[in-house]
């Protein structure tokens, strides 16, 4: 039924954010492992704060069908804001989703 399908999808989505994804990476700073670090032109001048949620896994640079998570500088990416920048709405929606779930 629809209710069960939506509950299953919400569990899958929250688990994905907390680290059950192809990169084995928690999108929540300070929770889980392999948290993405934010860098800008090979500098780590900006830091993510504990509890913040990063943008996360998106498409690949040259392939919109693929997925990617840039965790460190590489030749084709000089900054990883697209993946590792924290946004307040991510945390707000995550908290809302956790609060309305029946455990």
Segments (PLM) and residue ranges:
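Aromatic (Trp/Tyr) and acidic
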Residues: 1-103
């Amino acid at each position: 039924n629809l209710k069960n399908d939506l509950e299953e999808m919400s569990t899958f989505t929250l688990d994905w954010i907390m680290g059950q994804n192809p990169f084995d990476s928690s999108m929540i700073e300070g929770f889980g492992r392999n948290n993405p670090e934010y860098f800008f032109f090979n500098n780590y001048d900006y830091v993510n704060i504990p509890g913040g949620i990063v943008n996360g896994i998106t498409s690949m640079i040259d392939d919109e069908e693929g997925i990617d998570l840039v965790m460190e500088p590489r030749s084709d990416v000089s900054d990883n804001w697209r993946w590792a920048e924290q946004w307040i709405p991510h945390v707000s929606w995550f908290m809302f989703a956790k609060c309305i779930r029946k455990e």
